């Protein structure tokens, strides 16, 4: 079953929360975000530290400090957040650095699974945090046009 880890899910929620902060407004604390979404604070604090170390967030020290996005939300993809927390997305062992399994020589599903893997990566790379925080539209990089973020739209991108 393909599934985001809880850490990646919480990371996306936190980054989306920060993207929804008005303007270049105040920083949001880990506690504020954890309380807003019912996320365990110690776990969220570790996730936010990881996102800070990878350059997606920066921390603001002080009593009114917290975390802010290091880049504009339209410049951060869902894939970047997931990768920062969990590392590369690996659908099967044949997509690891070693790329070998017991069935490598006789495998009949490697190529179809590679296509699925690439489609997932491509889609996650195209979904920005801005889109996640906004009106549910998918902004197409080629044209800049916004289209409804629907099943039909995903099918037209050849990812469903």
Enumerate the language-model features and the residues they cover.
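C-terminal regulatory/oligomerization modules of transcriptional regulators
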Residues: 98-160
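Conserved segment of winged-helix/HTH DNA-binding domains
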Residues: 73-98, 109, 113-118
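Beta-hairpin "wing" of winged helix-turn-helix
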Residues: 55-69
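Alpha-helical residues within the helix-turn-helix
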Residues: 35, 52-53
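Short, hydrophobic-biased segments on the C-terminal half of alpha helices
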Residues: 48-49
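N-terminal helix-turn-helix DNA-binding core of bacterial DNA-binding proteins
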Residues: 6, 12-39, 58
């Amino acid at each position: 079953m393909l599934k985001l880890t809880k850490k990646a899910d919480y990371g996306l929620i936190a980054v989306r929360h920060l993207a929804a902060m008005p303007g270049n407004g105040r920083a949001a604390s880990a506690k504020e975000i954890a309380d807003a979404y019912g996320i365990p604070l110690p776990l969220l604090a570790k996730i936010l530290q990881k996102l800070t170390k990878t350059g997606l967030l920066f921390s603001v020290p002080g009593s009114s400090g917290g975390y802010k996005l290091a880049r504009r939300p339209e410049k951060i993809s869902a894939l970047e957040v997931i990768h920062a927390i969990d590392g590369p997305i690996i659908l099967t062992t044949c997509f690891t650095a070693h790329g070998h399994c017991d069935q490598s020589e006789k495998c009949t599903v490697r190529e179809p699974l590679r296509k699925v893997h690439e489609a997932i990566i491509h889609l996650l790379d195209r979904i920005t945090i801005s889109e996640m925080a906004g009106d549910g539209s998918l902004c197409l990089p080629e044209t800049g046009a916004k289209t409804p973020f629907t099943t039909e739209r995903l099918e037209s991108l050849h990812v469903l």
